[in-house]
Amino acid sequence: MPGIAVAQQKSLKDQIIGSWTLVQAVDTQADGTKTNPWGANPKGAYMFSPDGRFAQMLFHTDLPKIDNRMGGTPDQNKAIAQGVVAMYGSYTVDEANKTINVKFEGSSFAKFAGTEGKRVITSINDNEFQSTNPATSTGTKADSVWRRVK
């Protein structure tokens, strides 16, 4: 019909580009048990650039506050090592399967470097997306909610 404009839907890649902050993270074990691996109020950032680069950081709610990052007790250092994950690399988007495929170039968890991962986008709009990591390094399925930084 003349005079009727049809809005084109954005691609998943166009929707995901930008900076996001972590709202919720829940891991599900094989037996169905759910845990909050990053605490009750997790902190984190996820950034996707238009040229296919990403960076992600996850922080536990209750990290020890130490005066010198080169110091700390063994227990404090262990809590920090277990309570922080940062990674970066490149990504591609599989529009048909609604997945983000990541190639880790570096990570605070050194085992990730040189590996690949998949994040299934289960829901997305202009302000929020939900994703699932079907196979974490701890053997769980991780579901997370991210809100766009304005």
Residue positions per predicted region:
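Lipid interaction determinants
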Residues: G3-K150
